[in-house]
Amino acid sequence: QDQVIKFTTEGATSQSYKQFIEALRQRLTGGLIHGIPVLPDPTTLQERNRYISVELSNSDTESIEAGIDVSNAYVVAYRAGNRSYFLRDAPTSASRYLFTGTQQYSLRFNGSYIDLERLARQTRQQIPLGLQALRHAISFLQSGTDDQEIARTLIVIIQMASEAARYRFISYRVGVSIRTNTAFQPDAAMISLENNWDNLSGGVQQSVQDTFPNAVTLRSVNNQPVIVDSLTHQSVAVLALMLFVCNPPNANQSPLLIRSIVEKSKICSSRYEPTVRIGGRNGMCVDVYDDGYHNGNRIIAWKCKDRLEENQLWTLKSDKTIRSNGKCLTTEGYAPGNYVMIYDCTSAVAEATYWEIWDNGTIINPKSALVLSAESSSMGGTLTVQTNEYLMRQGWRTGNNTSPFVTSISGYSDLCMQAQGSNVWLAYCDNNKKEQQWALYTDGSIRSVQNTNNCLTSKDHKQGSPIVLMACSNGWASQRWLFRNDGSIYNLHDDMVMDVKRSDPSLKEIILHPYHGKPNQIWLTLF
């Protein structure tokens, strides 16, 4: 057992809590998949390294320890003085490695929310979280024996430690509640994230051509569905830590792993071939013109239909072809400006039918190294292949739900991004303010809900350029943004991120700046 990770409620600030959560995440991280931290692969985890403990205290004399299973970041036991209590579903090895010098007892319920809520006689939505709740939990668990109250306090600790380690959205909510000294109850968005952690983790790790095997339905804070079916979906950036599900096929295996371990390790299936829409510029869909499947018919951008229809549905085949109604998305040639057509897969030149969909929403033809592009901003424009410049008109997102993800965006000092005419700056967050609502489109643009013809745009391609609202019809590289799991909002073309100028919101300026990861470059979608 190395250093115990500690958090004390005494003199706690949102900063001390943030440091605690970051230390916990670091201890739990086993690697990266698609750039997102993931828990260790259980097959490579030795039992003696499987558990860690976290010390939670109110003072020098009042503290408990929570035992966490590294393979799922879950609380499996707690220690109070020289007694320890294990949840009924704790792995058998837990008591061999956790709190060994204590008298060990088994609780008569397991750690699932279903069981805990049943015993607590309250749902998660009814149980307030925050510093006060954590103080009470620590002092009660020190000596309390009432099952109902144990269950209730464990619900508090699990969410403020385990769930917060898993999600930036949840650690943010707790941080704000500590800073403002107000309790909060989990909303629909938070509950849906907690309930879908394994689904989201699996979606990311099993993704094929940037696409989840199954859509994951989250909820927004006002309980509207948020359907996530692509790695490029902007909500994926709230994941701080994934459950290990499987290694992506042909992932570069670390040479340090012993062969036998790698063979035992679970590899994701590569057989999966999703059929999805492909949303792009202005939220339009890749569409076979006029439903015509004759060879050479052009592919256009058209508004996504209300119903899923064949000429907007594409199967992402494992042979790297993209097919509608059995025919292949095919480039007419390998020169910039060549048009993209539907063609019989067997008679087309094979290389002209191969596409790779990158994690950043780029669809590229490997032979020509040209990318799928919607040069026209109007409906019905023919799609072509062009030199890759990471333009907004070259950004795509797969999935059957191509509607924009509408959310507020919080940043430095927990302030929210706000549109003001053609400017954008930070203001106190207010869910009811239209000017703080942003529509995140399939093309990577960020648009003010007040006028979705206006996109967040960096004025220039150089460090320090202000970010303002400009017409989306330009389809520029300076209008395409990627929400990354490190919290940055990243511009692919410029390799820079959104930055609150000099960490001073009173300057009322958000600028383009190289990434350094300080708080003035960290953003979060608030659902």
Swiss-Prot record:
It holds the Pfam family RIP. The keyword Cell membrane does not apply. GO terms for molecular function: carbohydrate binding; rRNA N-glycosylase activity; toxin activity. The keyword Disulfide bond applies. GO terms for biological process: defense response; negative regulation of translation. It comes from the Eukaryota. Its EC number is 3.2.2.22. 1-beta repeats lie at residues 325-365. SUPFAM superfamilies: Ribosome inactivating proteins (RIP), Ricin B-like lectins. 1-gamma repeats lie at residues 368-400. PROSITE patterns: RICIN_B_LECTIN, SHIGA_RICIN. Disulfide bonds join 246-268, 285-304, 328-345, 416-429, 455-472. Keywords: Disulfide bond, Glycoprotein, Hydrolase, Lectin, Plant defense, Protein synthesis inhibitor, Pyrrolidone carboxylic acid, Repeat, Toxin. 1-alpha repeats lie at residues 282-324. Disulfide-linked dimer of A and B chains. In the N-terminal section; belongs to the ribosome-inactivating protein family. Type 2 RIP subfamily. The B chain is composed of two domains, each domain consists of 3 homologous subdomains (alpha, beta, gamma). This is Abrin-b.
